[in-house]
Amino acid sequence: MDYQKLENSLIDVIKEEQAKLGYRKEEIRLYYPLGSLNHFFDTNGNEEEMTELLKGFAVYTKERLGEVRYGNRGERFCFFIPPEGSEYVHIHTPEKEFIKELVALVGKHGCTMEDIRALFLHTEKKIHREAIANGEFDELIYFEDDTEDTYNYCFKDEGCHIIYHRFLPEDYADFEF
């Protein structure tokens, strides 16, 4: 079983968390819906089938993230990453400068959508940008040809600040915005 997409996602989420909150060598719990896990493995399994599929994940990630444990309640799966995993991500993965810059930018008072657009354009990568009128978000931006950052970034201007969420393209499509 190829667990690389799931491991990459866990690492990306931990990096984003560390950009927002700072690094601490501590256990982290990350939650994924069954649908997202099915996207990682290109499957359409139920909870029991996913539990079976994940049996080799701890062995696969042990050298990098430590003894990752997982459990589920219905279609909601929780991954327990030990302190060693948090430390590994902090020390051994390349810096995701873009996510750090984005987190810092949206954390500033007075951040605007123009500031967000400028940050994306500053990367000199080809981006896709579109207005969204779904009540949840105002704008969608993603990198068109970036194989490492494949997320869809969704932004909402709440008047006094900008919030964002990032989704894997398959998860974004599931929302049917």
Identify the function of each model-found stretch.
Residues 59-92, 147, 158-162:
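Charged low-complexity interaction tracts in eukaryotic proteins
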Residues 23-44, 96-106:
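Short glycine-rich, basic-tinged beta-strand/loop micro-motifs
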Residues 93-131, 173-176:
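Short helix/turn-capping signatures at newly exposed starts of structured segments
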Residues 159-177:
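A short, surface-exposed interaction/processing loop segment used at functional sites
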Residues 43, 144, 174-177:
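Long, compositionally biased intrinsically disordered regions
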Residues 111-155, 167:
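A cross-family detector of function-defining hotspots
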